[in-house]
Amino acid sequence: MSAGRQIFIEFVIQGNVAKATAIDPASGIEACVMGPANAPKAALADAARRKLEFLMKKKDGN
């Protein structure tokens, strides 16, 4: 992804599980990761962002 691209990160915590979703608003592609609720939000956000980058590259055929 380009350095200037906007990404939204959403967190949902339910019980002892946290779900982080990275969303690219330009394409509408979403990537979700799950982890323990006590995991650092930065770690979950980074994992979701990396998964989103992977999915976007896969979609582009690279």
Located regions from the model:
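Amphipathic, hydrophobic secondary-structure cores in small proteins
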Residues: 4-59
